[in-house]
Amino acid sequence: MTLRDLLADSPDNSLSGIKWHTLKQSIVKCLLSIGDATILELSTELQSSIPTISKAINELLADELIVDSGKISNSGGRRPSLYSVASDKTFFLGVEANRSGTSFGIQNLKEEFISIDLDSSFILENTYESLMEFCDRIDTFISDSQVDKSYIVGVCVNLSGRINSKEGFSYNYFFKENRPLVEIISEKIGLPVYLENDTRAMTFGEYAQGVVEGEQNIIFLNYSWGVGIGIITDGKLYYGKSGYSGEFGHSPLFDNEILCHCGKIGCLETEASGWALVEQFKQALQNGRTSAISIDNDTSAIEQYHKILSGVLVKEDNLCIELITRQSEMLGRALASLINILNPELLVIGGDFSRLGDFVLLPIQSSLKKYSLGLVNRDVAMKKSILGRRAGVMGACRVIKEKLLTPLT
């Protein structure tokens, strides 16, 4: 038996079989949550007798799903054993697909990467053929990682746009009203699959392993091709009713008659985003501005976008800096409204633009000071993401673990 088998439904459909299976699931979930525990601690936590817990522990040991981690050193008398989930047989796979490429990462229980690939150029398109290739690439990554597939307890796929994580639907990719996307992918790769919004996963990654240092109320800004936010309140990801929270880029802030990708006019993204930057750069050149950066109209908009960003870092091009400064000031003003409403402890700036450092951070900070309430502004610290492109796959792996810890009903 693998951990994935244990976390699935009981093979014994009798009442006693289901009850016993559920107890062993609860023990494993408890150990995943707290790290390690004695039989007495598990008995207290799960409100089950010591003999019953001992019997279940012995079965889990026999199945090599948990291990004896050693004795408690500071206990008087007979020292009890500590038990933990077998770390060499428990892995989480995070996958992030966006307009720039696809990233893969497998983490162990210690949240260490066993294998990671952030450089796949595969672009997921909204076609069935592309989805099947996407699934094949997941399988190839697992095979190349040399991690036994049976030890991967779950896969979390991050996609942009509106994601219903509870039901497994993406409303931007492969939306089939009667078939959740997670079912299609799971059927193809043979693993449990979860779906998450890319910005929310990045937020969780930063919270778990990034710049967050104990703060419990956080706004994460994903400033990339599009613009979104992730929100953590009291240490928990905020989803909203159906999981669509964080569509910050579609705030209707401008009377500019520019059509957004969402179908509305005047969204924040129409003035401050990667795709807006490309349009603004082209328009500036048409208006007679000069730049050290030249973009080939035969290349994709995504390639043009990354070239403009590189123009700031590599050549410190005046036009690129001017456009990004203007965008960042607009974002700062929009963020000031959020800060006034939510009163967070920490604002994390992430996404592609964050690698530009002070070229983005200083204009945002200036606008925050100018437009947010002084008392509220003094409460919030602003930091740049330290995880970069790893944030998404880190968060995806963490999402799987959190899903496994969902209380049994």
How does the language model describe each region?
Residues S160-I163, S224-G226, F353:
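Short glycine-rich anion-binding loops that position phosphate/pyrophosphate groups of nucleotides
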Residues S120-N217, F359-K369:
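Glycine-rich phosphate-binding loop and adjoining helix at the ATP-binding site
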Residues D88, L109-K110, K166, T233-D234, ...:
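Short, ordered coil/turn segments that flank beta-strands lining enzyme active or ligand-binding pockets
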Residues L3-L7, D12, I116-L118, N126-S130, ...:
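Glycine/GP-enriched mid-protein hinge/lid loop-to-helix segment characteristic of carbohydrate kinases
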Residues F92-E96, I152-C156, I218-N222, G228-G230:
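Short glycine-aspartate micro-motif
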Residues M1-S69, S75-R78, L82-L118, I123-D148, ...:
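ATP-binding/phosphotransfer module of carbohydrate and carboxylate kinases, centering on a glycine-rich
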Residues F113, I163, S170, L237-Y238:
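Hydrophobic "anchor" residues
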